[in-house]
């Protein structure tokens, strides 16, 4: 890679071009910061810029231009030859004209980092968008960083308790790990991520970073106001704020959506390197891939499977490998991942599976039964579900719950054709228990209180294990199914059963 320019070389830019021969010898060695180029072509989010010989910016450098009074940042994606570069715009390119001057900043996009970002909303290039004045910070950091080396990484296994029964019991989250929430449209990914922010971020003493990648602006706005109301953030940031928000929503050009996750991650990395335990929420990783696929064709790359960019695995890997726990501090990341047409084998969700410590799969068939969170207990996995980590009792209970549910699933065809009466007594008991377990896996959420009217519940891990242990051992076979629906602990289910019995009497 060519070296950065010295002040002398930068000054030399303004002189007339040297004779052809001398310039050719220099092109490989000189990369001038502050070099000025001209726009030669604009195709949507992709802009071509030509530079003088010997002034070619490096790949991933940020270029800046003025677009009708607004600062427009372009990121170099390709060298085209003939001293021309192809760039991706971080904002709308409407109004750009050929021949317009573009300046090389000499480095990648850099964003403000540090405590001053807490309580603020920023866009992909680190500009505040919450109308609360500039982000007063002296430290900035480039959004493109190398992943920490093996020696720096920490491998401690510890559980992060969420207070959500189905998660804590069957697919527990790792502290300092990567968690994926998979689901199609409208099965509750965003509600679940908001509940995790509510349960984990509020109880968590450290800092949180939320990256809104290509999702609804309304949800981003709601989250901002909820955080202020609940005391996680102060209006306009400042002392007492605990979360930084970075948004590149649905209405943004693909350049912004393809980079905004890296902007959020850069802020989280800075806190981690200062020794903090950081929570990093991303909604939605699929939009990061989708934005990459949008610009990929414009960059002239041949599409890969299902029309995705050929660099899909590389793009995902470069980002995911940076989300890691080091000996200095930890990043626990929760990522919502949209599943197109409910197809988990689609390349976008399938590529992210390999990077995760725990996967929570949301299922439409469970949502149709009115069971929320609509987590599929048989499809969700976690590397933390190991007797050496969670303990023998937790492991045994969770495996018994899964085997009971699996047995019910296997019997469903028989029930549909022949009915319940044709089952053996043993199978009837298993089906009755499985139906109670299914309902007991539901739980009222704090963030859904406004829709459901029922107050949210946070269930301690001991209570979750106790309740399900009793269920699989048949201690609650006498209670009706309805008693287990939308309650917190098993004691609440018993209370509800008494109420139902009193009403029926």
Curated annotation (Swiss-Prot):
Which cell locations does it reside in? Answer: Cell inner membrane
Keywords associated with the record: ATP synthesis, ATP-binding, Cell inner membrane, Cell membrane, CF(1), Hydrogen ion transport, Ion transport, Membrane, Nucleotide-binding, Translocase, Transport
Q: Which GO terms describe its molecular function?
A: ATP binding; ATP hydrolysis activity; proton-transporting ATP synthase activity, rotational mechanism
Residues binding ATP, per UniProt:
183-190
Q: Output the InterPro entries linked to this UniProt entry.
A: AAA+_ATPase (IPR003593), ATP-synt_VA_C (IPR055190), ATP_synth_F1_bsu (IPR005722), ATPase_a/bsu_AS (IPR020003), ATPase_alpha/beta_chains (IPR050053), ATPase_F1/V1/A1_a/bsu_N (IPR004100), ATPase_F1/V1/A1_a/bsu_N_sf (IPR036121), ATPase_F1/V1/A1_a/bsu_nucl-bd (IPR000194)
Q: Where is this region: Disordered?
A: 1-25
> Top enzyme class of this protein?
translocase
One GO cellular component term = plasma membrane
Q: Does the keyword Signal apply?
A: no
Q: Principal place where this protein is found?
A: membrane
Which reaction equation describes what this protein catalyses? Answer: ATP + H2O + 4 H(+)(in) = ADP + phosphate + 5 H(+)(out)
Q: Recorded E.C. number(s)?
A: 7.1.2.2
Taking the record's annotation, the residue ranges forming a coiled coil are none
Q: How does it sit in the membrane?
A: Peripheral membrane protein
What family does the database annotate? Belongs to the ATPase alpha/beta chains family.
The annotated subunit structure for this chain is:
F-type ATPases have 2 components, CF(1) - the catalytic core - and CF(0) - the membrane proton channel. CF(1) has five subunits: alpha(3), beta(3), gamma(1), delta(1), epsilon(1). CF(0) has three main subunits: a(1), b(2) and c(9-12). The alpha and beta chains form an alternating ring which encloses part of the gamma chain. CF(1) is attached to CF(0) by a central stalk formed by the gamma and epsilon chains, while a peripheral stalk is formed by the delta and b chains.
The role this protein plays is: Produces ATP from ADP in the presence of a proton gradient across the membrane. The catalytic sites are hosted primarily by the beta subunits.
Its protein name is ATP synthase subunit beta
Origin species: Sinorhizobium fredii (strain NBRC 101917 / NGR234)
């Amino acid at each position: 890679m060519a070296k950065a320019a010295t002040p002398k070389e930068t000054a030399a830019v303004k002189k007339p071009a040297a004779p052809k021969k001398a310039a050719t010898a220099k092109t490989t060695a000189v990369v001038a910061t502050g070099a000025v180029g001209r726009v030669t072509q604009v195709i949507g989010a992709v802009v071509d810029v030509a530079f003088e010989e010997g002034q070619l910016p490096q790949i991933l450098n940020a270029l800046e231009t003025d677009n009708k009074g607004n600062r427009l940042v372009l990121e170099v994606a390709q060298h085209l030859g003939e001293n021309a570069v192809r760039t991706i715009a971080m904002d709308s390119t409407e109004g750009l004209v050929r021949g317009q001057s573009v300046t090389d900043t000499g480095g990648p996009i850099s964003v403000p980092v540090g405590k001053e970002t807490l309580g603020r909303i920023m866009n992909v290039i680190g500009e505040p968008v919450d109308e609360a004045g500039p982000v007063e910070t002296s430290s900035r950091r480039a959004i493109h960083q190398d992943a920490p080396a093996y020696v720096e990484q920490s491998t401690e296994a510890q559980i992060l308790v969420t207070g959500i029964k189905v998660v804590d019991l069957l697919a527990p989250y790792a502290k300092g790990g990567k968690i994926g929430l998979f689901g199609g449209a409208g099965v509750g990914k965003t509600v679940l991520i908001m509940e995790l922010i509510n349960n984990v971020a509020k109880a968590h003493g450290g800092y949180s970073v939320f990256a809104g990648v290509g999702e609804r602006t309304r949800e981003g706005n709601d989250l901002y106001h909820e955080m202020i109301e609940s005391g996680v953030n102060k209006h306009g940031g400042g002392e007492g704020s605990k979360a930084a928000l970075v948004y590149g929503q649905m209405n943004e050009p693909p350049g912004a959506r393809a980079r905004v996750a890296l902007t959020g991650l850069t802020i989280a990395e800075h806190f981690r390197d200062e020794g903090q335990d950081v929570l990093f929420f991303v909604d939605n990783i699929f939009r990061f891939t989708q934005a990459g696929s949008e610009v990929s064709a414009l960059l002239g790359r041949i599409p890969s499977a299902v029309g995705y960019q050929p660099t899909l695995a590389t793009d995902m890997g470069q980002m995911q490998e940076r989300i890691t726990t080091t000996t200095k501090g930890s990043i626990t990341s929760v990522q919502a991942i949209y599943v197109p047409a409910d197809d988990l084998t689609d390349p976008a969700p399938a590529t992210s599976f390999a990077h995760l410590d725990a996967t929570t799969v949301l299922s439409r068939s469970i949502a149709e039964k009115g069971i929320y969170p609509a987590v599929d207990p048989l499809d969700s996995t976690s590397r933390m579900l190991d007797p050496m980590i969670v303990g023998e009792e937790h492991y045994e209970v969770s495996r018994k719950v899964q085997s009971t549910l699996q047995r019910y699933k296997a019997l469903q065809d028989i029930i549909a054709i022949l009915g319940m009466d044709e089952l053996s007594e043993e199978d009837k008991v298993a089906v009755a228990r499985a139906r109670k377990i299914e309902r007991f896996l539901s739980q009222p959420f704090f963030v859904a209180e406004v829709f459901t009217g029922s107050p949210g519940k946070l269930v301690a891990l001991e209570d979750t294990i106790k309740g399900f242990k009793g269920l699989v051992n048949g201690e609650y076979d006498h209670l009706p199914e309805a008693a287990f629906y939308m309650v917190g602990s098993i004691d609440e289910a018993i209370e509800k059963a008494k109420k139902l019995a009193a009403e029926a009497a």
